[in-house]
Amino acid sequence: MFGLDPTLLFLLFFCLFAACAFEFVNGFHDTANAVATVIYTHSLKPTQAVVWSGFMNFLGLLTGGVGVTMSIIGLLPTELLIDSNVYHSMAMALSLLISAILWNLGTWYLGIPASSSHTLIGSIIGIGVGHALLPENSNKGISAINWDKAIEIGQALLLSPLFGFALAIILMYILKKTVQNKAIFKEPKKNTPPPLWIRAILVTTCTLVSFFHGRNDGQKGIGLVMVILIAFLPGYFAVNTNLDLVEVKTSLIQVRQIVAKIDTVPLSEKEVESYHKVLKAGDELDTILVDGLTTAKLSVDQKFQIRKAALTINKNAKKLIESESVALSATDLNALKRATAGKKAPFFSFGASSSSGIAGITDFAPAWVMWLVALSLGLGTMV
């Protein structure tokens, strides 16, 4: 099956099972965050709260697109995602899964409120550091890790609790000053639900926390599964085989035309390097696509070349877009963003999801992957 020998096929299914187990553990590990208040205040019965939370996690993941998914995959060094040696990729996938699952299970068993997101991101960065320290990668070292993306995600993880803490204090202060009925600030009586309006607020917040947990944390599971599929079956999942290559070529032409307008004189050394990388990768991608080949006819090596070129273009084009030294009109900057990162995804994108522009080559997830992870997360939440 899939051209894999029995051992690799077994390991593929084992890794997929482990990824589902991670999402399952993620579900029952994080359920308390959403349902604690509605159960404690008797707004909902425990079974009602847990089932409702599970359903909203499931729905949130299915409608969330792949934005967070690609941020997770983007943490890995590009070389790891285009390694044609399946055993290297297998070691990466197993290391990631085993470390994340063991920590999640351990913290759940000991009752430690640890974050699944921190666990997964830490595992991915650990893999990147381990890969960078291998003798054959000594020339690049830890610079091969996507530190820009790691810092971006790290800032979000650090700011999230601070934002929640500050906003909770402000809202509590406003309620204390404006609500006349002080009974709502006292400990709830046994088996007595709160006033209807308080109950409605608590159920609404439980619903929204569960829904957005699925949209955010659930997508990390999709990223995990996609890393496994790219590692074991690059011929099927290294690039999006359903993408319209005419659209890709149109986006590529736009990128090359706009980047060619940039005056390199005021740019720093690193920005000039990014400039040349975009143009070189654009030439490589155009060479592969010039004959109008469909991805179904391309070899695995060619798909890896397409993936590498697309990742290189997007990564370095983003640096140029964000640079203050790049003198481009607002129209050109917006066109470059659309041609590389694609249009902003709709809030609801049910089922299979992918980006547009050149990002659409690598930023995608099949419908069955989203359903698999959504079911794992939803069922785990109900445990």
Where are the language model's segments positioned?
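Residue-level signal for short hydrophobic patches within transmembrane helices
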Residues: 10, 14-25, 52-55, 204-215, ...
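Transmembrane alpha-helical segments of multi-pass membrane transport proteins and ion-pumping complexes
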Residues: 16, 20-31, 57-70, 96, ...
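Cytoplasmic-side transmembrane-helix entry/capping segments in multi-pass membrane proteins
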Residues: 114-122
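Low-complexity, proline/glycine-enriched hydrophobic segments characteristic of transmembrane helices
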Residues: 234-368
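Interfacial segments of multi-pass membrane proteins
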Residues: 37-45, 121-134, 225-233
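Helix-loop-helix hairpins and the membrane-proximal interhelical loops
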Residues: 1-15, 70-91, 180-191, 228, ...
